[in-house]
Amino acid sequence: MGIMLDETDKAILRDLQEDASISNLNLSKKIGLSPSACLARTKNLVEAGIIKKFTTIVDEKKLGIEVTALALINLSPLNRETIHSFLEDINKFPQVQECYTLTGSHDYMLKIVAKDMESYRNFIIDSLMQNPAISGVDTSIVMSTEKRTVSVPIDEM
């Protein structure tokens, strides 16, 4: 069960998810609080761990990153030691943007970005597959991104 939020907290979260660079003054005006009350509520949301961080979304294509891949990973043997080793390794690689533990026929799914297909291939062979616990990598290349959001649906809470 999640933390109970009132409508003001939800409004703060909605607005910050839309634009994390909004000033506290503008945010307070938008939601109808004094700046000090708005700042206190925002700090409470951070301290409660509801707001994990404030960040910027970058257009990777404009930086020359042309490949986004979803790699399904299998580990063998699948035990605490291999899982720990795998997670330590992938956290070292900036190309790995996301990692999910799965149920079903694959153990993990990674979202990996690379400059081009050659860079992706080199990353898989020279970096990722150096972990002996990885027994298989099944890759799908993203052709286009139709929806991308990091926002949580606040109104569904």
From Swiss-Prot:
Keywords: DNA-binding, Repressor, Transcription, Transcription regulation. GO terms for cellular component: cytosol. Residues 24-43 bind DNA. CDD domains: HTH_ARSR (cd00090). It comes from the Bacteria. Gene3D superfamilies: 3.30.70.920, Winged helix-like DNA-binding domain superfamily/Winged helix DNA-binding domain. The keyword Nucleus does not apply. InterPro entries: ArsR-like_HTH (IPR011991), AsnC-type_HTH_dom (IPR000485), Dimeric_a/b-barrel (IPR011008), Tscrpt_reg_AsnC-like (IPR019888), Tscrpt_reg_AsnC/Lrp_C (IPR019887), Tscrpt_reg_HTH_AsnC-type_CS (IPR019885), WH-like_DNA-bd_sf (IPR036388), WH_DNA-bd_sf (IPR036390). Coiled coil: none annotated. Residues 5-66 form the HTH asnC-type domain. GO terms for molecular function: sequence-specific DNA binding. SMART domains: HTH_ASNC (SM00344). PROSITE patterns: HTH_ASNC_1 (PS00519), HTH_ASNC_2 (PS50956). The keyword DNA-binding applies. Pfam families: AsnC_trans_reg, HTH_24. GO terms for biological process: response to amino acid. Transcriptional repressor of the azlBCD operon involved in branched-chain amino acid transport. PANTHER family: LEUCINE-RESPONSIVE REGULATORY PROTEIN, TRANSCRIPTIONAL REGULATOR AZLB. This is Transcriptional regulator AzlB. The gene is azlB.
